[in-house]
Amino acid sequence: MREKWAFLENTPQDAAINMALDEALLHWHQKGEIPPTLRFYRWNKPTLSIGYFQKVDGKIDLQGIKKHQCQLVRRMTGGSAVLHDDELTYSIVISEKHEKVASSIRQAYFDLSKGIVRAYQLLGIEVDHAHEPSSKGRSNICFEQPAFYELVAKGKKISGNAQIRKRGILLQHGSIPLSMNVEMLFDLFQFPADQMKERKKQRFYERATTINAELGEKQSYERVRNAFQQGFSEILNIELEPITLTEEQWKEVYQIAESNYSENNIKGAVSHV
């Protein structure tokens, strides 16, 4: 018998609301108010999300953010910066004690990401986990280099994912780009010289890919969304039951957005959860 999970999908939201809703789901599951949950979401503006410990000063080009009318938000998870634009974003909240969650962070990620692997297969893309850790230090830009066990297609990183455990609950969320505006992405970072920017941009093209690039044609969001819903359902052996948020739940989301994801929380490391 398939286990029943909640499935949440809503209209595109701004950066603070999207991050606050992920955090709220973690709280609600910890309190037993919702079952394990899979969420799909989108962004109403291009957004650069930065890792919990990632520096802004000297790294992020705030003029570039303004130029491209992007939003900037700090995630509750670690890792490098991700440009969210033409993509499907997902999140999973589940208890650390759940039988599907390994005690090892790496193994838990590996197990949960099998649903992502299956979804790519349904789309006609063969992906695998990177089996060698990067020999270089962490980049400011996600997708520039795959970390150990992250997903790659023909050696190129195709999905960026991050995980955190708080109060006995695991939250994993990730970016599934259909396409990527690399010119915009590199305008959002500071570089010592234009030559270095161009070198890094070229290297990025060699190391990162997207769904559209792999399939050679533009895919509809609906096709990608359906593949990922099926992929997670099959591999995790779950039945997804759609839910909607109550007015009170939305109020809580807006409160979290204001307290934890406002502009005041961008420069320094925020303290929440």
UniProtKB/Swiss-Prot annotation:
Annotated protein name in UniProt: Octanoyltransferase LipM
Source species taxonomy: Bacteria, Bacillati, Bacillota, Bacilli, Bacillales
Biological process, per Gene Ontology: lipoate biosynthetic process; protein modification process
Keyword Lipoprotein: no
Record InterPro entries: aa-tRNA-synth_II/BPL/LPL (IPR045864), BPL_LPL_catalytic (IPR004143), LipM (IPR024898), Octanoyltrans_LipM/LipL (IPR050664)
EC annotation from Swiss-Prot or TrEMBL: 2.3.1.181
UniProt keyword annotations, A-Z: Acyltransferase, Transferase
Species this chain originates from: Oceanobacillus iheyensis (strain DSM 14371 / CIP 107618 / JCM 11309 / KCTC 3954 / HTE831)
Note: In the reaction, the free carboxyl group of octanoic acid is attached via an amide linkage to the epsilon-amino group of a specific lysine residue of lipoyl domains of lipoate-dependent enzymes. The reaction proceeds via an octanoyl-thioester enzyme intermediate.
